[in-house]
Amino acid sequence: MRKDPLVIAGREYQSRLLVGTGKYKDFAETRAAIDAAGAEIVTVALRRMNLGQSKDAPNLLEFLPADRFTILPNTAGCYTAEDAVRTCRLARELGDWKLVKLEVIGDPQTLYPDMRQTYDAAKTLIAEGFEVMVYSVDDPVACKTFAEMGCVAVMPLAAPIGSGLGIRNPYNLRIILEQATVPILVDAGVGTASDVAVALELGCDGVLLNTAIAAAKDPILMAEAMRQGVEAGRKAFLAGRMPRKLYASASSPVDGLFFE
């Protein structure tokens, strides 16, 4: 395959699959799934995982060395801009991380983002020098606003977090992609490899997922499937699919037939 890196905040990555670290039975399974997925960027919820905050609990970084993986701290569990900003500041103190995934939840049932709180947090974080990858609704206006204000990537949801419903509104995603000036990565809602392939076929720069792997009957096998789905979808996008037609079009030649 041609050289086709994912570029975020000026850094190149060969994998377009970003993965989370929650819901696995232990850190060993987490690492095995990440390796099977081929992921280079691994997102971690600072409010739920130990990255050095506690000396008495296992440290995830012992399984995910920083020289091999890009750790992407996220603000999962935050419901206000203030909490999200505080969490990102903690990430910078713990590991000098400035690339962060911002999410500010507005509703505990749907886990949809609170866009006002997210905007306020993004504004503060960007001003403080953070490189913000922002979780958003699949609203073209909101996604464009986040890009214009300086977010290094915009991550619209495909469906509610952990739902596994797949891409519910490909048409909004197409509009978001048409006007994109920063990488667009689907975040949340994918359930299986075909969902990932569709996202990449549409032109998304990548996909971030967690539950689709961790909640599978065989997480390691599903991680492999997700990696292959990303690769197939990206290749199909670069190749350019045939146009859709209402009527049939024979693939065999119609002239020079034997019985003519």
UniProtKB/Swiss-Prot annotation:
1-deoxy-D-xylulose 5-phosphate binds at G162, A188, G189, N210, T211. One of its GO terms (molecular function) is thiazole synthase activity. The active site is at K101. It catalyses: [ThiS sulfur-carrier protein]-C-terminal-Gly-aminoethanethioate + 2-iminoacetate + 1-deoxy-D-xylulose 5-phosphate = [ThiS sulfur-carrier protein]-C-terminal Gly-Gly + 2-[(2R,5Z)-2-carboxy-4-methylthiazol-5(2H)-ylidene]ethyl phosphate + 2 H2O + H(+). GO terms for cellular component: cytoplasm. It is an enzyme of class 2 (transferase). Its EC number is 2.8.1.10. It is found in: Cytoplasm. Its main location: cytoplasm. Pathway: Cofactor biosynthesis; thiamine diphosphate biosynthesis. Keywords: Cytoplasm, Schiff base, Thiamine biosynthesis, Transferase. One of its GO terms (biological process) is thiamine diphosphate biosynthetic process. The keyword Transferase applies. It holds the Pfam family ThiG. Signal peptide: none annotated. Belongs to the ThiG family. Catalyzes the rearrangement of 1-deoxy-D-xylulose 5-phosphate (DXP) to produce the thiazole phosphate moiety of thiamine. Sulfur is provided by the thiocarboxylate moiety of the carrier protein ThiS. In vitro, sulfur can be provided by H(2)S. Homotetramer. Forms heterodimers with either ThiH or ThiS. This is Thiazole synthase. It comes from Acidithiobacillus ferrooxidans (strain ATCC 23270 / DSM 14882 / CIP 104768 / NCIMB 8455) (Ferrobacillus ferrooxidans (strain ATCC 23270)).
